[in-house]
């Protein structure tokens, strides 16, 4: 199958999946703003509310494109799993951008899925995946502890730590410095463009940048060279 035909099917599936994720994230953020708990029940309620005709059409069209790709052997099991992981990352990024929360109902299943796929022989070696999950969480936990000691309050949420742990489970430990570098540079650039000289005082959610860097890592490999 030529790359042109692959793109013709993959891009519509990606766009339709993005529409579905945006709809779910909007409904979830609305419920959180209304006082709902940040838990799996609220997320499930948002999923049910999003199951309208538009959402079902988007999901059906995306599934049809994926099935065609599988039948034409243009999408293997690992690529299919990573596509699903990218959808979850997109949903997490949209939720964090709206209500500054990364729900455990998404980050923890994402991490366990990466570990289980690694154990099944898909993705990095099990030892690398386990080390990546541990390193991702512990590194950001350590950075946050230093920030608390220095400034007297936390600099990031536990959801960021769990998201990096999930990315470590999918990518292994080696690409994590690259993911963090790309996410940090992206966040710094957005802060400077938005607030200028006051950027160092601003706060913005880190989840969207982590999700974007992790998504590029899943789709295209390393973001930058590991030694750098």
Question: Whereabouts are the PLM-identified features?
Answer:
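A membrane-topology feature that recognizes alpha-helical transmembrane segments
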Residues: 1-228
């Amino acid at each position: 199958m030529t790359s042109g035909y692959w793109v013709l099917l993959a891009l519509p599936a990606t766009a339709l999946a993005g529409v579905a994720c945006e709809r779910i994230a909007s409904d979830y953020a609305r419920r959180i703003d209304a006082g709902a708990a940040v838990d799996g029940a609220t997320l499930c309620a948002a999923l049910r509310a999003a199951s309208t005709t538009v959402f079902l059409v988007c999901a059906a069209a995306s599934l049809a494109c994926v099935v065609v790709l599988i039948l034409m052997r243009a999408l293997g099991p690992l690529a299919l799993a990573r596509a699903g992981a990218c959808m979850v990352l997109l949903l997490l990024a949209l939720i964090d951008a709206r209500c500054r929360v990364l729900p455990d109902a998404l980050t923890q299943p994402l991490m366990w899925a990466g570990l289980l796929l690694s154990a099944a022989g898909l993705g990095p070696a099990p030892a690398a995946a386990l080390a990546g999950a541990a390193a991702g969480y512990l590194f950001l936990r350590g950075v946050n502890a230093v920030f608390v000691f220095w400034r007297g309050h936390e600099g990031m949420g536990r959801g960021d730590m769990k998201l990096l742990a999930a990315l470590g489970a999918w990518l292994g430990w080696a690409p994590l410095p690259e993911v963090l570098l790309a996410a940090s540079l992206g966040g710094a650039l957005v802060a400077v463009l938005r607030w200028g000289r006051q950027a160092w005082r601003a706060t913005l959610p880190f989840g969207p940048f982590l999700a974007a860097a992790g998504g590029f890592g899943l789709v295209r490999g390393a973001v930058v060279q590991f030694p750098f």
